[in-house]
Amino acid sequence: MIIFLKKYKSKIALIVFICVLVCTVSCLLDFKTLGKQKMPGLEKKSVFMAAENTVAKNTDKAVNEPRLHAVSAALYDADDETFIYGRNMRDSMANASTTKLLTCIVALEKADINDTVTISQNAASQPAVKLGLVAGNSYNMKDLLYGMMLESFNDCAYAIAEHVGGSTEGFAKLMNEKANEIGCLGTYFITPNGLDAENDISFHHSTAGDLCVIMSYCAWKSPKSTQFLEITQTMQYTFETEEGQMVFNNHNRLLTETDYCISGKTGFTTKAGYCYVAAVEKDGRRMCLSLLGCGWPNNKNYKWDDAKSLVEYAVSDAAEDSYCDAACVTTQQ
């Protein structure tokens, strides 16, 4: 055996070398082929990575991306109907008195602004903030609309809802139908004034994205947009009642603190925090912004700071170059 191995040593070595070479080449060819195949799991991961890359590109474009306090926020181009910026903009959240945007436009579309409204005990007993409507007394619809939109009076909202819808439940149905009609499928309203409530279906809520669309409809697309803007742009409104002269002051600070704001509505409940929705215009470019959960007591001015940041972003070159689609999600956490 030893003699045999010595005799054929060189041939055995050659055979071993050839075998190793063949195996190596075969493995390399298999690996190359495997790399071209769409392997389960890897394909999904690549799609996810592509989405991450898209977000990263948007981040690169949005050099001046706003830094916000709000839990949820959105910035919307009303003409292109696309979202420019979003933070948790599809999350269902309590939205407080920003609800009154839809209350106002539904009332304007369904009733006459000169209607006489008789106040029920239910409307008169609404909690603050309230005008102090007296049950059994009558008021002009126009005066109630100004009270609701300028001072955010809860009793005015209830009186309007009962007059237009026959009941607050009937009016809520009209509100939700309008929300669905304009594409706001993440909105479900129970109360006309935005106070927190729940029923067997859900809780009173909207989304930052939906509120931008609602504001866009109110300000520019409703057949009653002109009346809506006239009401929400009025800085002070005075009228006479059986109880004496009433003076309402507009609480939308951005009307006077920026050159771009043309309408807006504030809101607050313990659950919702401070909220704000606004419409802005710049050189014919129409946009809406919304902020939900923008601080709680002791942080009342956060909404103004955030709104100004979004307004500045809206009219900056960064916003003009950073459009995203309706599924827009923020890259800022």
Question: PLM features: what roles do these ranges have?
Answer:
Residues 1-72, 316-333:
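N-terminal secretory targeting signals
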Residues 2, 35-209, 219-221:
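Active-site-adjacent loops and short helices of periplasmic peptidoglycan-processing enzymes
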Residues 9, 149-152, 179, 183, ...:
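Generic secondary-structure transition motif, activating predominantly at the C-termini of alpha-helices
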Residues 15, 19, 125, 168, ...:
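Hydrophobic alpha-helical segments and their boundary regions
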Residues 26-29, 184-185, 200-333:
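Domain-terminus/edge residues, biased toward the C-terminal soluble/receptor-binding domains
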